[in-house]
Amino acid sequence: MAKLPVEKMRELERRFGEIEARMSAGPAADVYVKLASEYSELEPVVKKIRDYEKAISEAADLEALLADKTTDKDMRDLAEMELPEVETRIRELEKDMQVLLLPKDAADEKSAILEIRAGTGGSEAALFAGDLFRMYERFAATKGWKVEVLSASEGEAGGYKEIIATITGRGVFSKLKFESGVHRVQRVPETEASGRIHTSAATVAVLPEAEDIDVEIRPEDIRIDTMRASGAGGQHVNTTDSAVRITHLPTGLIVTSSEKSQHQNRAKAMQVLRSRLYDIERQKVDSERSADRKSQVGSGDRSERIRTYNFPQGRVTDHRINLTLYKLDRVIEGEIDELVDALIADYQAGQLAQLGEQQL
């Protein structure tokens, strides 16, 4: 087990006390909001640190009693009974704190941009992309997050060829960041008379929603084109040019949005562009920092097949962690907590293993 960073623990306690004092002093509203946010992040960590320090102190007192030859028999028996319990509690607290004290991903608390694109499989792939979007939409609802569709291209038989949405809420990215990759479905299409199982796929990308301070986009680096927005069957949804296409010249990235309001389109397209550029920079930093990373979960390779949804067998399998659940009907309805939590736990275990190796 990796050693606990004692200096970091003391620094967190000191910072927590400083925030408490500043909040009590009645700062300006905007300052108070920032302090309250940091306070809520630090509170569970500092509580665990204090529980740990208390347990260490209890163990030291019990050991002193046992070492003292003048301790009477009843007290000695009580100390011998309590010490193993306290030592077990210390080990559990150490495990909890190692996870809490792992280096934080700066984007974890952000909202997210969700992009789903139908892959191989034609109409069935578009239907599956629609199923995935509804799965994430329902999962978001259970968390109290807000989902807003930025753009969507519907499939001919339903579902989506492509759909892009924002999911707004605290910590969205931390929960959904491991959903990026190729999702595969195996099922019998409704139009399949012979009952033959078809395999199709959809690609999911989850990007942290970037703010202006995260990415600077210079006006001279973008080209904005307007065109007529069209709905299903190519019908014009309004008589004015409203669809917007923004091209980021240095990277060649192209983002489109086709709501009725041109002003909204530009804002939404810039929102997606900013997040994609931020994600590119994050991917670059991550690959440089952990070229030898062992954790398959954290690789972020969006061409990688990460999960299979097998409808005839009622199972969903995440290939990165070899986890199979036989409750596909509930998973596809948005009950993905077990998958999400298992992926996060696996990633944290990989981080802890690396930390332990670095300390050897």
Curated annotation (Swiss-Prot):
Pfam families per UniProt: PCRF, RF-1
Q: Which residues cross the membrane?
A: none
What's the domain of life for this entry?
Bacteria
- Which GO terms of the cellular component aspect does the record hold? cytoplasm
Q: Answer whether the UniProt record assigns the keyword Cytoplasm to this protein.
A: yes
Q: Where in the cell is it found?
A: Cytoplasm
> Known post-translational modifications?
Methylated by PrmC. Methylation increases the termination efficiency of RF1.
The record describes the protein's role as: Peptide chain release factor 1 directs the termination of translation in response to the peptide chain termination codons UAG and UAA.
According to UniProt, the name of this protein is Peptide chain release factor 1
State the species of origin.
Answer: Agrobacterium fabrum (strain C58 / ATCC 33970) (Agrobacterium tumefaciens (strain C58))
Lineage of source species = Bacteria, Pseudomonadati, Pseudomonadota, Alphaproteobacteria, Hyphomicrobiales
